[in-house]
């Protein structure tokens, strides 16, 4: 199949959007599973209380609570026993662009001369082990793997489907290697929200997508901006 990647570098608007599109994913940090907030290779500090929910999933599809451990500049997560996947939601609050073009973490009514305001929500789905058969959960934005990534290897095809509020989202490109090549994008999703990617890394893989929903009746913001990721780490043999 064709594996055409488009770089948004040629389009100033797309570059600006990508630069602002921080996401979250989970990754091992000193033996713990950390909730990482950043863009590309960036690993930024954040207030751990912004993590609003972490749910573990068993192979049966059952949901279980996960334990969130607040640290000084981030949060760790302890998935439920036997969890094969988990979802994380981080509410980054409302960001308003002032008359000087700079954004502040305040609602529109508190910024004189505000140009625009957006409520930023970050969502992650992490595949922990083989056997995860996830379905859309109805979140504002999510990426669902249509094949078990943990059974694949680098270079293998990985079909995915994008959903917004539980419905397939057509016409959006995905960031195919968000950590290592943060501007590389896939072809756009088809009418069913589907697109076939390929596994980029023999290790941590993070795939991202962004989508905004207008809020015309809300005086404090103009839209809700979602950034969702699908992440997984291919298993390695024992050293």
Residues of each region from the PLM?
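Short acidic/polar inter-strand loop motif in beta-rich domains
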Residues: 91-99, 213-218
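Sec/Tat signal peptide C-region and signal peptidase I cleavage site
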Residues: 15-23
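Short amphipathic beta-strand segments in non-cytosolic proteins
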Residues: 54-64, 173-186
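N-terminal targeting signals for Sec/Tat export/insertion, comprising classic cleavable signal peptides
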Residues: 29-60
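Bacterial N-terminal signal peptides
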Residues: 6-16
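Glycine-centered loop-to-beta-strand initiation motif
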Residues: 70-75, 189-203
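Short, ordered, surface-exposed loop/turn motifs in non-cytosolic proteins
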Residues: 46-50, 167-177
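Beta-strand-rich domain onsets/edges
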Residues: 22-32, 103-158, 163, 167, ...
């Amino acid at each position: 199949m064709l594996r055409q990647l488009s770089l948004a570098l040629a389009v100033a608007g797309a570059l600006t959007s990508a630069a602002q599109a921080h996401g979250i994913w989970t990754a091992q940090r000193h033996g713990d599973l950390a909730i990482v907030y950043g863009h590309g290779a960036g690993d930024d500090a954040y207030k751990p209380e912004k993590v609003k929910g972490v749910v573990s999933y068993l192979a049966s599809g059952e949901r279980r609570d996960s334990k969130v451990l607040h640290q000084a500049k981030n949060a760790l997560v302890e998935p439920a026993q036997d969890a094969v996947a988990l979802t994380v939601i981080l509410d980054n609050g409302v960001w308003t662009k002032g008359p000087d073009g700079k954004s502040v973490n305040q609602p529109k009514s508190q910024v004189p001369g505000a140009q625009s305001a957006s409520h930023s929500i970050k969502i992650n789905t992490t595949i922990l082990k083989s056997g995860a058969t996830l379905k859309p959960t109805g979140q504002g934005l999510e990426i669902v793997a249509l094949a078990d990534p943990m059974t694949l290897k680098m270079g293998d095809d990985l079909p995915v489907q994008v959903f917004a509020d539980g419905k397939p989202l057509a016409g959006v490109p995905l960031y195919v290697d968000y950590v290592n090549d943060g501007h590389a994008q896939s072809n756009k999703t088809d009418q069913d929200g589907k697109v076939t990617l390929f596994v980029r890394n023999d290790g941590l893989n993070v795939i991202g997508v962004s989508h905004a929903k207008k809020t015309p009746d809300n005086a404090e913001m103009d839209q809700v901006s979602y950034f969702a990721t699908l992440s997984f780490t291919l298993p390695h043999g024992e050293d």
